[in-house]
UniProtKB/Swiss-Prot annotation:
Keywords linked to the UniProt accession: DNA-binding, Nucleus, Repeat, Transcription, Transcription regulation
InterPro entries hit by this protein: EOBI/EOBII-like_plant (IPR044676), Homeodomain-like_sf (IPR009057), Myb_dom (IPR017930), SANT/Myb (IPR001005)
Function: Transcription factor.
Record protein name field: Myb-related protein 340
Listed GO MF terms: DNA-binding transcription factor activity; sequence-specific DNA binding
Gene: MYB340
The UniProt record lists the keyword Ligase: no
Originating organism: Antirrhinum majus (Garden snapdragon)
Cited CDD domains: SANT
DNA-binding keyword on record: yes
C-alpha cells in the first residue's frame, strides 16, 4: 500500500547525500533569516528535506564555526578528562570544545577505543606466543613496523616449529597491505596450530 500525502502541504521528502545546491540554499536561508523552527526552515527554504535533516546538516557541517581537521592532542586530553567525569554525554562534552560537534567527538571516542582494544589484543597475542615480550612491550603494539612484525613471526615460527614433530608451514611475513599492520581473520586462522587430536 502506497503512502499518500495527508494534505496539499506534504511533499516528497528527499533522502540520501546532500548536494552542493542544497547546502547553498540552507546556508543562504539561515544567513538571511537565522535559525528557528527547523521544519519551517526546511519548508520555507524550498528544501525537500525534513527539519531534522536540515538541523543536523547545519550543526554538523555547514555552521561557520565548525572546526575542520583532526582532533588535537590538547582536545584528546580534554575529551578523556570530560568523559571520565560525565561519561557518554557528548553534547555536554562538546560545549567545552569550541567548534567540535557532539557527533564528531562521539565518533572520535568510539574509533580510538576500538583501535586501543585491537592494539591490546595484538600485544596480548604476541605476549602469549613469545612470553619474553609480554612484560617489556605489552603496552605498545609490536606490529607497528615491519621489523617488529618479521621478528614476531620468526619468534612464533621458531617457538612452534622446533617443538613440534611435524612440518607445519608458517608465514614468513605479515601482509603489508593492511593498515597499521593489523591482522585479518584470514591471517590469524592461517597461523592456527593443527589439531593434534586427528
Amino acid at each position: 500500500m502506497d503512502k499518500k500525502p495527508c494534505n496539499s502541504h506534504d511533499v516528497e521528502v528527499r533522502k540520501g547525500p546532500w548536494t552542493m545546491e542544497e547546502d547553498l540554499i540552507l546556508i543562504n536561508f539561515i544567513s538571511n533569516h537565522g535559525e528557528g523552527v527547523w521544519n519551517t526552515i526546511a519548508r520555507s527554504a524550498g528544501l525537500k528535506r525534513t527539519g531534522k535533516s536540515c538541523r543536523l546538516r547545519w550543526l554538523n557541517y555547514l555552521r561557520p564555526d565548525v572546526r575542520r581537521g583532526n582532533i588535537t592532542p590538547e582536545e584528546q586530553l580534554l575529551i578523556m578528562e570530560l568523559h571520565a567525569k560525565w561519561g557518554n554525554r557528548w553534547s555536554k562534552i562538546a560545549k567545552h570544545l569550541p567548534g567540535r560537534t557532539d557527533n564528531e567527538i562521539k565518533n572520535y571516542w568510539n574509533r580510538t577505543r576500538i583501535q586501543k582494544h585491537i592494539k591490546q589484543a595484538e600485544a596480548s597475542f604476541i605476549g602469549h606466543i613469545n612470553p619474553e615480550h609480554s612484560n617489556e612491550q605489552a603496552s605498545t603494539s609490536l606490529l607497528s613496523s615491519s621489523c617488529h612484525a618479521d621478528h614476531a613471526v620468526e619468534s612464533y615460527s621458531s617457538s612452534f616449529n622446533g617443538n613440534m614433530g611435524n612440518n607445519v608451514q608458517y608465514p614468513n611475513h605479515f601482509p603489508t597491505e593492511s593498515n597499521d599492520y593489523f591482522w585479518s581473520m584470514e591471517d590469524l586462522w592461517s597461523m592456527q596450530l593443527p589439531n593434534n587430536g586427528g
